[in-house]
Amino acid sequence: MKLVTYTRLHSDNVARLGIWSGDVVLDTYRAAEILGIDTKRRSLFGSMEHLLGDWYETWPELQAMAAACPEEARVPAAKVCFRSPVRRPPTVRDFYSFETHVRNARARRNLTVPPEWYEAPAFYFSNPGALIGHQAAVTRPPGTKALDY
């Protein structure tokens, strides 16, 4: 199950929570409405933040929604713009944990992967305001000649 935050293209630009499967995104709030989930609980399916805040309670309902996948709550994936899954995370930690990436980056400087790298995960705090959604255009900062992968 792929949970996404999205907006509808050429629409009101309101961020919505969805379940993405193939070429369809299921609008979870609309699905909750169709499936008769009461108004108070329905709000939990309106955003990723609300859903994650009550994860253990909402997970069974989310699975039921995905299984039912009401037609009226389906949105073609081609008609959505994916956003950052969590719109305003309080913090982001980026782990320097992919060996191939570390090896390639260090090889450019004629360095090997140090033994310490295998002993403890390295991470750094990243900018939570710089997150973007799937397939969103990455803006290259002025003066930048190349981007990392």
Give the location of each predicted region:
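Active-site microenvironments in enzyme catalytic cores
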Residues: 1-11, 20, 29-149
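Extracellular disulfide-bonded cysteine-rich modules/repeats
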Residues: 15-17
